[in-house]
């Protein structure tokens, strides 16, 4: 670990330094802390940096001056991550030109681009770091052995972000199980979950969410799709709702990677989930409230709410939906319709494949995986502009975040594009870390925590020494 110490002009209150889950407490990563930095590099505005062994695309979470994150260490070599969203398509096209049959093509693709369970032996860890110094307080191994399923090298074996209530940390890894630890690293309980096949061994990614005394997960896979609630005190399953969505024959897509959302609105509190081709909302006992067709076959962006509306990204080539509280039944739009009694508006061409949009200062900022950046009025759905961040912007998986009148877009090469908030597109600067990046950052008071493939950084604005 290396770190730099300097004097600061102010001290963040502990309450402002809580980041309890993926994309923050409100699932919309913004902050009003004016001390947060908008410039950084591997040497600039670095409070500390800590090497994190292994690999994981899970985000850091923060509570009571501690950072928690997961990683997986592989015995021997692990296949290097892939940038972009080509996946294996180009490779398949090359093999087809060689005249290979389908069976041989699939064998070569799996050998090059996937890690299968029999190929790797893994050790899964939960790390606890000190927020002020980056020092590792403790680490706990919570699973080991061959994984229950494989992964594409675009994914990791720990892409799910833990969640905390300030008393315990709840770690969910798809097809492995749920684990609970106290803040001193003592394991409180462990609940295995069944291992179900994911489409083409792409791996899992949907994080858990927490409300009251319950932990909620969604598992959209090829065999037994379900949403479930568990008692956070014991790990026992409280309810399970089977989901029959997506394609139903052969090996067609029934898997998804979307984190669910607890929507506390003026009518009720509900669990919003997005699966293949269909979004479904449940009450907190697992009863279906409403459903919406028209979602992509392989959804990834997460739903979230602000300003009284729920925003649901339908995926690449699909609409962005704004949904009113109190919906019931099938709220799917009719042919050619852009709104109905439950849907306030849709913007038909604004769905994206990977990053989740961010809502900031009355607008939605939508980032596509190839660097196309859009601003949409959050109340009306009117498109303000659509622009390319840069001719060489690269590829994006991380969701954008916002503060101090700026939107931040981190690409997979470690470059962050800083865009001015407002009705005109203006790229202010880029910040370069020169390290592969797939994890969404955390904002903890006046600290920005960014996880790259090898390192966790704490960025904090320097001030003059006293």
Language model region names:
Residues 1-9:
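Sec-dependent signal peptide recognition
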Residues 8-16:
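Hydrophobic h-region of N-terminal signal peptides that target proteins for export
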Residues 16-466:
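Noncatalytic, solvent-exposed loop/strand surfaces
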């Amino acid at each position: 670990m290396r770190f730099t110490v300097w004097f600061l002009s102010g001290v963040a209150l502990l309450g402002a330094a809580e980041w309890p889950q993926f994309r923050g407490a409100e699932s919309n990563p913004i902050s009003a802390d004016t001390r947060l930095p908008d410039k950084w590099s591997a040497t600039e505005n670095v409070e500390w940096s800590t090497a994190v062994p292994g690999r994981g695309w899970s985000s850091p979470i923060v509570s009571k001056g501690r950072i928690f994150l997961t990683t997986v260490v592989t015995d021997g070599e692990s296949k290097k991550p892939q940038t972009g969203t080509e996946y294996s398509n180009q490779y398949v096209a090359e093999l087809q030109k060689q005249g290979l049959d389908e069976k041989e093509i699939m064998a070569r693709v799996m050998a090059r681009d996937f890690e299968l369970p029999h190929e790797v032996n893994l050790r899964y860890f939960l790390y606890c770091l000190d927020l002020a110094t980056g020092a590792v307080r403790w680490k706990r191994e919570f699973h080991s052995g061959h994984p229950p399923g494989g992964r594409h090298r675009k994914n990791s074996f720990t892409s799910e972000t833990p969640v905390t209530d300030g008393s315990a940390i709840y770690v969910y890894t798809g097809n492995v199980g749920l684990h609970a630890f106290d803040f001193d690293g003592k394991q409180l309980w462990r609940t295995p979950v069944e291992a179900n096949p994911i489409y083409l061994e792409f791996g899992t990614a949907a994080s858990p969410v927490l409300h009251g005394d319950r932990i909620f997960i969604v598992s959209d896979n090829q065999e037994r799709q379900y949403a479930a609630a568990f008692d956070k005190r014991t790990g026992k399953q409280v309810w399970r709702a089977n989901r029959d969505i997506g394609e139903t024959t052969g090996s067609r897509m029934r898997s998804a990677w979307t984190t669910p959302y607890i929507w506390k609105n003026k009518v009720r509190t509900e669990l919003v989930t997005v699966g293949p081709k269909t979004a479904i909302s449940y009450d907190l006992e697992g009863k279906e409230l409403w459903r919406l067709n028209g979602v992509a076959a392989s959804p990834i962006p997460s739903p979230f709410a602000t300003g009284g509306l729920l925003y649901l990204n339908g995926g690449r080539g699909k609409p962005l939906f704004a949904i009113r509280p109190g919906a019931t039944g099938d709220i799917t739009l009719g042919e050619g319709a852009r709104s109905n009694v439950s849907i306030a508006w849709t913007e038909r061409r604004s769905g994206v494949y990977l990053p989740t949009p961010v809502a900031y200062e009355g607008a939605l900022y939508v980032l596509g995986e190839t660097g196309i950046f859009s601003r949409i009025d959050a109340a009306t759905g009117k498109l303000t502009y659509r622009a390319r961040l840069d001719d060489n912007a690269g590829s994006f998986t991380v969701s954008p975040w916002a503060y101090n009148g700026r939107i931040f877009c981190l690409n997979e090469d470690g470059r962050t594009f800083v865009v001015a908030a407002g009705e005109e597109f203006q790229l202010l600067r880029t910040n370069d870390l020169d390290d592969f990046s797939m994890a969404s950052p955390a904002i903890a008071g006046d600290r920005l925590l960014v996880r790259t493939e090898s390192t966790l950084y704490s960025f904090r604005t320097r001030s003059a020494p006293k």
